[in-house]
Amino acid sequence: MARVKRGVTAHAKHKKTLKAAKGFYGRRKNTIRAAKAAVDRSKQYAYRDRKVNKRNFRALWIQRINAAVREFGLTYGRFIDGLNKAGIEVDRKVLSDMAIHEPAAFGALVEASKKALAYLKEAGTANEFESAVR
């Protein structure tokens, strides 16, 4: 069996790892063993934080919607409840964007939500409301 010399592939692999570790502090940027450990850990953080990022953005959208809705005298939970009962399906990202950039359109949604909540209070049941809306 022929001898395999790994000089070229090993050098390429090391170069790839060191390129990924560029910008790291201290030994982690120029020593292969430390750089490999640091790059592996950074990939773990990146994987985890892609999930965390989604949670953080959803929380931010909810805070923005809550702040905008309180100007109309509603809470976030009541507003979402009213939208669901009115049959309006708009996701939180769009609602947050509307609250910031299109206050008039957002106000119309708040009024629709209030109307649905008030009508439901009068009607008594959700089934009566559904038949009245259609």
From Swiss-Prot:
Tell me the Gene3D superfamilies matching this sequence.
Answer: 6.10.160.10, Ribosomal protein L20
**Entry's transmembrane regions:** none
Q: Which cysteines are joined by disulfide bonds?
A: none
One GO process term, biological-process aspect: ribosomal large subunit assembly
Q: Which GO terms describe its cellular component?
A: ribonucleoprotein complex; ribosome
| InterPro entries in the record | Ribosomal_bL20, RIBOSOMAL_L20_CS, Ribosomal_protein_bL20_C
Query: Organism's domain of life?
Result: Bacteria
What keywords sit in the KW lines? Ribonucleoprotein, Ribosomal protein, RNA-binding, rRNA-binding
A GO term, aspect molecular function: structural constituent of ribosome
Q: Which HAMAP family does UniProt cross-reference here?
A: Ribosomal_bL20
Q: Which family does it belong to?
A: Belongs to the bacterial ribosomal protein bL20 family.
Function noted in UniProt: Binds directly to 23S ribosomal RNA and is necessary for the in vitro assembly process of the 50S ribosomal subunit. It is not involved in the protein synthesizing functions of that subunit.
Official protein name in the record? Large ribosomal subunit protein bL20
Source species = Sinorhizobium fredii (strain NBRC 101917 / NGR234)
